[in-house]
């Protein structure tokens, strides 16, 4: 609404305010700080949730964990193929646009679904959205990057290896991993790769070992007074991510200027139709078909009670 109101100019000026992180030689607009910085916290929480499900939840078995992975492949491939079939030609470079899922939107859908979706389906959608998003980041890095800086890629790999070494040494101090996570974020940014990937990586690599549950009894049904570091951090960051980061992200990224000229141009554009068909038709159909084929081949197991309508809804 603001983007199409008299406040539009101030809105866009505000989002384009320059933020200088001179100590690490990084210049960001406010919009990029939100999308690259704050959203890293969101992705960290998502990574923690998936780690919890992989260790003791709905993704604990190999066949359960493989389900969102295989579904995501179909959900990326078919939209790209549909886009190429409709747009193609000189617009071939846009095939990656309908590939990605807006993970923040996916989480919003989970909230709206409430009790109508089982815990298993919610976990499936969350994992699917994360894999889909990571896939899109990798596609952009591999096919559309102007050239990643190898030295920073090596630094990023070093940060990931450092996490494994620290865990092997039994280091559990959270601030140590926070420092490594910051270094990983900087390395990915400097390498030309979307730095929010650092959040997912650090979330997935968080050690799932027991700590005291004092002051965190609301997080889990604790019987022995302990919970895992994953659960503790998830509880510590969840509210901040859900009630501050996501609303700010939505406010900053929903500013789409609408005009009759823009709408007419979109209607006449094969690129717009390719993106639309890829997302609206290709995404749910790709997820549905690959999931069904994988289940028939006994490669994966979908969440208990999953119906066809729910599977299509997940892809939408």
Model region roles, listed by residue range:
Residues 113-208:
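Functional cores that coordinate and move charged inorganic groups
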Residues 31-43, 90-104, 145-158, 196, ...:
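Structural signature of hydrophobic alpha-helical transmembrane segments
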Residues 44-60, 107-118, 161-172, 212, ...:
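C-terminal ends of transmembrane helices
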Residues 32, 51-66, 90-92, 119-120, ...:
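Interfacial helix-loop-helix linkers and transmembrane-helix boundary segments
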Residues 176-183, 187, 198-306:
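Predominantly late transmembrane helices and immediately cytosolic-facing juxtamembrane segments
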Residues 78-79, 98-124, 132-138, 286-289:
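Short helical (or helix-break) motifs at transmembrane helix termini and adjacent helical loops
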